[in-house]
Amino acid sequence: MSSLPKNFLQPLPLQPGDRLTVVSPSGSLRELADLQKGVDIWRSWGYEVIFSQGYHNRFGYLAGTDQQRRQDLLHAWLDPQCKGILCSRGGYGSARLLEDWQWPAISQPKWVLGFSDVTGILWSLLKSGIISLHGPVLTTLSDEPDWALERLRGHLQGLPLAPLTGNSWQKGMARGRLVAGNLTVATHFLGTEWQPDFENVILAIEDVTESPYRIDRMVTQWRASGNLSQVAGIALGRFSECEAPAGFPSWTVEEVLGDRLGDLGIPVVADLPFGHGGVNAILPVGSKAELDGDAGTLSFL
């Protein structure tokens, strides 16, 4: 586990003409048409989008060997002309890439954007005190509504982020560093060097295609490990396709989360517009945030 740095660096705002590099740190690409749609959006905004050497590699279910994926990420990170790194898709693989990995110090950090399995990459940047963006990968970008796209575009150009609104489950107010990610991926990082210190953070989580009992098992692990007793507030995104199998006696995922999170004595806001299967509004991982359990809002400070 690594303590969060006291101060975080935010990459500089992007300018039209800046270079962005596509990397595939996790699973191998399948959705080539969707990838191109995402690239076209970035190019329509005036950015130069280039592809890492191995973005379309295949090694089993991975986008290349661990070393190939490390090398692509490293090359983009060290490229002085590259101002941002766009992850092509999620899947699985970031945990393997992060073995024996350290972010090299550079004069000016750059934006890294992704979600799902990319949670591991975003959390590793926390250790270096660098703000990153939890948000659409290239293969899902074209599914975003106009307001979410403009919110992404504006923030990368230096505009403040508008708050997100959900539904209040537990009242109260909390402020802290925002740590966001996929619940399943995050759970597998507990107890590793990439697990951040959760003391006084706002934890934002989402998931997809996990049965309610599996969500219960993961959240119970967070409770038993003592991590949930440290967080200041919990922001819940979308838990998409998390229904129990037909004919299987079960609670709903909402009932599970309400039961497992309702006695922590901290604000909990649910149904925020981020995650799989719908709007995936960007979240600045590592930035300061405020969770208002009375108003049902997540704001960025």
Swiss-Prot record:
One of its GO terms (cellular component) is cytosol. InterPro entries: Carboxypeptidase_A_C_sf, Class_I_gatase-like, LdcA_N, Peptidase_S66_N, Peptidase_S66C, S66_fam. GO terms for biological process: proteolysis. Its EC number is 3.4.16.-. The active site is at S116, E206, H276. This is Putative carboxypeptidase slr1534. Keywords: Carboxypeptidase, Hydrolase, Protease, Serine protease. Belongs to the peptidase S66 family. GO terms for molecular function: carboxypeptidase activity; serine-type peptidase activity.
